[in-house]
Amino acid sequence: MDLGIPDLLDAWLEPPEDIFSTGSVLELGLHCPPPEVPVTRLQEQGLQGWKSGGDRGCGLQESEPEDFLKLFIDPNEVYCSEASPGSDSGISEDPCHPDSPPAPRATSSPMLYEVVYEAGALERMQGETGPNVGLISIQLDQWSPAFMVPDSCMVSELPFDAHAHILPRAGTVAPVPCTTLLPCQTLFLTDEEKRLLGQEGVSLPSHLPLTKAEERVLKKVRRKIRNKQSAQDSRRRKKEYIDGLESRVAACSAQNQELQKKVQELERHNISLVAQLRQLQTLIAQTSNKAAQTSTCVLILLFSLALIILPSFSPFQSRPEAGSEDYQPHGVTSRNILTHKDVTENLETQVVESRLREPPGAKDANGSTRTLLEKMGGKPRPSGRIRSVLHADEM
């Protein structure tokens, strides 16, 4: 380090006006007086050592600047003076002093820087979310320098209305109770657990932690309660199941009785139908017998009428009856035995008449007739009576 003694003193004794000045505090909305920057004991010791060395007229040795810086600079405060251009905090840049050489400055801790950045983000989100109130918890490291923001300027609530003010006044800040930050350590017991613990003869404290024996007893009691509840649930489900079965049995029995009544009615109806069927069968049998009798009677009547009426319509009656004049006897072979004497006389007269009527060339016919008579064994008598036996066939 090539810093001169006056420049080094000016750099380390100069208060951080850019961050914690009155204007900057009012700009952030912290209505509190600017903090005074006291000189710590380490700084006083360092200055005294430096002054004593300066009185002797000797400068800093090679290892003395590092020791001197370690007395004044905390690693949590050192950061680069050149802030990023996209930061929203607005406190990362400091007006440069052309006369003074660049020297490290003590600024806010990283946690404080993060809180200021979140305030700027909340200001940007105001138009989207509306006027709501959020919580900000400012936490610092174990090493907190005296020139940081005092306790009166720390806030716990931050409204989103950042146009009017970012942080509320010191009088409106509500401190957060410690009970909300710590977990509840109270032991809560139900009436059933208390009753079982009383039966066991064990009294548990109302605050945690418990001893191992007390934890075992409490687990045992809670296990008993769970077993009891599970048994009650199983009995309840079993009872509901049995009740459902009983209701189903009652419904089935009622339906069975109704079906039995319907079956009895159907049986009676079936019996009546069977009786009607038998009656119909008997009626059909009687009507069939009567129909057969009537049909036979009608057939007999028609046959008799046919026998009576058909002879009158015989084809023989349509021919005219042949007279005695038109009748011409012909020789017919007959097998009948004729013994009557009138038959022979008639035959003779017929033969004579035929001879008279026939021409002379008809001898053969007469001869045949005579031969026929001779064959018949008849002999002519002078009286004209011939007795003979003729055999003729009936046609």
UniProtKB/Swiss-Prot annotation:
Induction info: By androgens.
UniProt-annotated location(s): Endoplasmic reticulum membrane; Golgi apparatus membrane
GO biological process: positive regulation of transcription by RNA polymerase II; regulation of transcription by RNA polymerase II; response to unfolded protein; spermatogenesis
Gene3D superfamilies per record: 1.20.5.170
Transmembrane segments: 296-316
One GO CC term on file: nuclear membrane
Membrane topology (UniProt): Single-pass type II membrane protein
Tissue specificity of this protein: According to PubMed:11830526, exclusively expressed in the prostate. Expressed in breast and prostate cancer cell lines. Expressed in prostatic luminal epithelial cells (at protein level). Expression is significantly more abundant in prostate cancer than in benign prostatic tissue (prostatic hyperplasia). According to PubMed:12111373, also expressed in brain, pancreas and skeletal muscle, and at lower levels in small intestine, testis, leukocyte and thymus.
Site (Cleavage): L338, T339
Lumenal side: 317-395
Sequence segments annotated as region (Basic motif): 219-248
Keyword Transcription attached: yes
Domain of life: Eukaryota
Region (Disordered): 82-108, 355-395
Entry's Gene Ontology molecular function annotations: DNA-binding transcription activator activity, RNA polymerase II-specific; DNA-binding transcription factor activity, RNA polymerase II-specific; RNA polymerase II cis-regulatory region sequence-specific DNA binding; sequence-specific double-stranded DNA binding
UniProt cross-references to CDD domains, sorted A to Z: bZIP_CREB3
Region Leucine-zipper, annotated ranges: 259-280
Domain bZIP: 217-280
Protein name as catalogued: Cyclic AMP-responsive element-binding protein 3-like protein 4
Organism, as annotated: Homo sapiens (Human)
Upper taxonomic lineage: Eukaryota, Metazoa, Chordata, Craniata, Vertebrata
